[in-house]
Amino acid sequence: MAKNPPENCEDCHILNAEAFKSKKICKSLKICGLVFGILALTLIVLFWGSKHFWPEVPKKAYDMEHTFYSNGEKKKIYMEIDPVTRTEIFRSGNGTDETLEVHDFKNGYTGIYFVGLQKCFIKTQIKVIPEFSEPEEEIDENEEITTTFFEQSVIWVPAEKPIENRDFLKNSKILEICDNVTMYWINPTLISVSELQDFEEEGEDLHFPANEKKGIEQNEQWVVPQVKVEKTRHARQASEEELPINDYTENGIEFDPMLDERGYCCIYCRRGNRYCRRVCEPLLGYYPYPYCYQGGRVICRVIMPCNWWVARMLGRV
C-alpha cells in the first residue's frame, strides 16, 4: 500500500507533461496560422493596390488613320503611337512622295524623313510639359523687349552642313529610320510682319520649296489660330534693321550655332522673341501617350538674343 502514492505521482507528472506539450503545440499552430493569415492578407492588399494604382504600361502600339482634303485632293495620314518608347510616327503619301514624321518625346527630338529626297531633317522639341501657372505680374503688351511669334509665322530652314555626330540619336527611333540618309538640323526663321500682311491682304502665296510646302500642309491641323500683330511695333522694328548687331566678335567672342539650334538663345535677333506653339499632352496620365486632347495647350517661351546674355553677364543690362 505504501508504494501506490509514488506510482500515482509519476502518472500525474506524465499526464501534466503531455497536457503541457499539447498546449504548446496548439499555441504554436495558432501563431503560425496568424502569421500565414497576415501574410496572405498583405499579399492580397499589395496585389489589389498594384492593379488599381500602378499604371500598367501597354506593350502594343496603337494605329490610327486620318483622312483629310488638301487642295481638293483626298489624302490619308497614318499615325502610330508606341507608349513604351514614347514615340509618335506620322506617315503620309506613297512612293517618292512618302513622308515620315517621328516625334521622340523620350529624347526630345522630331525627325522628318522625305523618301524622295533621301534626307532627314531634325529639330528639337520639349520632353517634359511644363507646369502652367498664372504670372504673378502682368506683362505690359507695349514692352519693347519681346514680340510674340506663333507657329504660322515661322518657317523651318535646313542648315547648310549635314549632321556628322549622331550620338545624340543613339537610342532614338529617328536613327532607325534616318540611319542611311543625310541628316540636317532645321532652324526656325521668322516671317516679317509685312510679309504676313501681304499674304493676308493681297492673297499672294509665299514661295516655299516643294518639300517644305508639303510639310506645312501636313501640319495644318496643329497650327495655332491666326492672331493680329500690332503695326506700331513693326515700325520700330524697321528702324532697328538699319543698326548693326553687336555680336561681340571684335572682342574675340564667337557663339556656338548649337545655342541657336537648341533654342537657348538667338544669335541674329535684335530683341527677345516670344515663341508659342501647341503641345499635346496626356489626359490625367492615361495611355496612349501622348495624344492631343482638345487641340492641345498653348505654351510660350521667351528666347533672348545671345548678345543680350553676354551684356547681362558683363553688367551692362
Curated annotation (Swiss-Prot):
Residues 51-317 are extracellular. The modification Phosphoserine is found at S239. Highly expressed in hypovascular connective tissues such as tendons. Also has strong expression in adipose tissue. Residues 1-30 are cytoplasmic. Belongs to the chondromodulin-1 family. It comes from Homo sapiens. PANTHER family: CHONDROMODULIN-RELATED, TENOMODULIN. The chain crosses the membrane at residues 31-50. The keyword Mitochondrion does not apply. GO terms for biological process: endothelial cell morphogenesis; negative regulation of angiogenesis; negative regulation of endothelial cell proliferation. Keywords: Cytoplasm, Disulfide bond, Glycoprotein, Membrane, Nucleus, Phosphoprotein, Signal-anchor, Transmembrane, Transmembrane helix. It holds the Pfam family BRICHOS. This is Tenomodulin. Glycans are attached at N94, N180. Residues 93-186 form the BRICHOS domain. Disulfide bonds join C120-C178. May be an angiogenesis inhibitor. GO terms for cellular component: cytoplasm; membrane; nuclear envelope. InterPro entries: BRICHOS_dom, Chondromodulin/Tenomodulin.
